[in-house]
Amino acid sequence: MPEIVKTLSFDETEIKFTGDGKQGIFEGYASVFNNTDSDGDIILPGAFKNALANQTRKVAMFFNHKTWELPVGKWDSLAEDEKGLYVRGQLTPGHSGAADLKAAMQHGTVEGMSVGFSVAKDDYTIIPTGRIFKNIQALREISVCTFPANEQAGIAAMKSVDGIETIRDVENWLRDSVGLTKSQAVGLIARFKSAIRSESEGDGNEAQINALLQSIKSFPSNLGK
C-alpha cells in the first residue's frame, strides 16, 4: 500500500496560533481539496472521511516526518470541511524540540505542513498531470515542515518501495521519495527497461543493471535514515 506525502506552504494552510501562542496551540489546513499541487496531483473532497471515521490509531505530529523521533505534539481535532482537512493541535509543553519548533513557526523559518497517508491501487486515478486521490486508506501523520511543496519530497521520502506494483508507481516513487524530476524518473525507468530487455536476450548486461541500482542507492534521500 503506497504511502504518500503532500505538503502545503503556511500561506495555503492558514496556520494561526491561539491567543498569544504561549500554549503552543495552533490550527489550519493540513490539506486543501481540488488543488493541483507541484506533482500535478489533486485530492478530492471527502478523501479523508474514511480514514477519519474508521482508523483507531491516533494521527501523530512530527517535525519533517521524523517518525523515529519523539512526537513534537498531538492533534486534538481533525475534520474535513468544504475547503480541506482542518486540524487543531498543540505542541508538547516542556519538550525542548517542540519549543524550538514553536519559535521557528512564529518566526516564519519553517514554511509548511504536510500529511503522510496510505492509499490502495483503487483509491486514485492516473491523469496526464499526475494522480487524483478520491480515498485515503489511513492518515499516518501530519508534520510541520521546513520546506513547502515539492522541496519536501527529498526530505520526507515517505513513499514505500513495498507498495510499488507498476512502472508508474516506480516513476512516482523516484520522484516523490528520491527527489528526481518527472523527466529524470522517466529517463531512468527507460534505462532500466533497456538493460533488463538486453539481459533477457542474453546480452549479459548484469553490470549495467547493477550500476543503475547503485546509482539509485547513492541518491540523496532519507529512506530509512
From Swiss-Prot:
The active site consists of 65, 114, 141
Q: Which GO terms describe its molecular function?
A: peptidase activity
- On the tree of life, the source organism's domain of life is Viruses
Q: What kind of modification does the protein receive after translation? A: Cleaves itself autocatalytically to yield the mature form of the protease.
GO CC aspect terms? virion component
The biological process GO terms on file are: proteolysis; viral procapsid maturation; viral protein processing
> Tell me, what does this protein do in biology?
Protease involved in virion assembly and maturation.
Name where it's found.
Answer: Virion
Q: This protein is called what?
A: Prohead protease
Q: Which residues cross the membrane?
A: none
- The gene is 4
